[in-house]
Amino acid sequence: MVKNTGVIKFKKSPYIIAEIGINHNGYLGLAKKMILESKKAGADAVKFQKRDASDLVNKLPQLGKSTGYLSKNEKDTNHKSKKFGTWVYPDLRLELTDKDYLELKKYCKKLKIDFIVTPWDEKSVNSLLKIGVNFLKIASIDATNYHFCEYIASKKKATIISTGMSTYKEILKTQSIFKKF
């Protein structure tokens, strides 16, 4: 947990984070509905994921038409077949814009629920800092991505680090990166 930053209010009961991730499917309205339902359910925070696909993947030819349950327009999917289509990553239709994230941050403030976003790349870190997030969160998969951890640590922003599947030695190394800054 973050110490002495006023970012997370410590209390005796657990701090509940509702993981929304990219389950909004690129729809701002659905993201807001998920925030509202999370608040009604008693969550203290909602957490999204932000990525800049151009930073994360090599530019390769598209291998297939993006279809299946992740389809945004629902016209290229036959749900009765119960067959998943091919999902060409990155499916940019699932991403929200920086403007959308700012709107979600304001919506969370209005509902009095904490707004958390896990960035997956340096461009996303910069975008989140620009919109004024209170803190950053590193996904467990990136807890041993020491270059990325150092980049985030250099921003001197309060940070929560998930450490699932990390060894004790790896956690200490990640911790030492943040202590340098």
Predicted regions and their residues:
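N-terminal amphipathic alpha-helix/helix-capping segment at the start of soluble metabolic enzymes
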Residues: 1-18
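A structural motif corresponding to the C-terminal end of an alpha-helix
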Residues: 41, 97-115
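Conserved, mostly hydrophobic/aromatic
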Residues: 19, 38, 128, 162
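Hydrophobic faces of well-ordered beta-strands that scaffold small-molecule active sites
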Residues: 16-20, 46-48, 115-118, 136-138, ...
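Active-site-adjacent beta->alpha loops and helix N-cap segments on the catalytic face
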Residues: 27-28, 95-101, 126, 138-156, ...
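Active-site beta-loop-alpha junctions enriched in small/polar residues
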Residues: 21-23, 51-53, 120-122, 139-141, ...
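Glycine-rich, proline-tolerant flexible connector loops at the mouths of alpha/beta enzymes
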Residues: 44-95, 124
